[in-house]
């Protein structure tokens, strides 16, 4: 179903999520990037699709500033972009893996469908 193509990933997969969504925003319905970051050159493209960025503030493998940086770049391109940044207080790189087991993330993603 080409109207329901979602991408999500954590750590290097979070970077990959931003990369795929940034390169092919016309093919992606919504994306979730956890503990990753992104290339600000994709900010314009990323601003065109629903994106939820999540990161723990105690992550020592990938600093949460990586997520904040791409979030700010997207909002600079389009202040009305449907992008959310959630910084998880006390979250470490491994502890936020639990997000993949929470229905809230999937309910959010699956609420979107391309027209």
Locate each region found by the language model.
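C-terminal catalytic histidine-bearing segment of alpha/beta-hydrolase fold enzymes
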Residues: 54, 60, 64-115
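Hydrolases whose catalytic domains are alpha/beta-hydrolase-1, hotdog thioesterase
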Residues: 16-20
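Solvent-exposed loop/turn segments at secondary-structure junctions
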Residues: 11-15, 36-40, 57-61, 90-95
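Surface-exposed acidic, glycine-flexible loop patches that form ligand/cofactor-binding
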Residues: 1, 39-45, 77, 114-115
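Short, proline-enriched alpha-helix->beta-strand connector loops that line the catalytic pocket
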Residues: 46-51
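Gly/Ser-rich "nucleophile elbow"/oxyanion-hole loop immediately N-terminal to the catalytic nucleophile
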Residues: 1-12, 23-27
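A conserved short beta-strand
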Residues: 26-37
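Short beta-strand immediately N-terminal to the catalytic nucleophile in serine-hydrolase-like folds
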Residues: 7-9, 34, 54
């Amino acid at each position: 179903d080409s109207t329901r193509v979602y991408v999500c990933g954590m750590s290097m997969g979070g970077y990959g999520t931003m990369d795929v969504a940034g390169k092919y925003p016309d093919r992606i319905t919504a994306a979730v990037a956890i503990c990753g970051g992104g290339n600000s050159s994709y900010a314009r493209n990323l601003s065109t699709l629903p994106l939820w960025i999540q990161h723990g503030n105690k992550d020592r493998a990938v600093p949460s500033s990586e997520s904040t940086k791409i979030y700010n770049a997207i909002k600079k391109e389009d202040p009305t972009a449907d992008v959310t940044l959630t910084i998880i207080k006390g979250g470490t790189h491994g502890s936020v893996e639990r997000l993949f087991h929470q229905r809230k993330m999937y309910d959010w993603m699956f609420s979107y469908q391309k027209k």
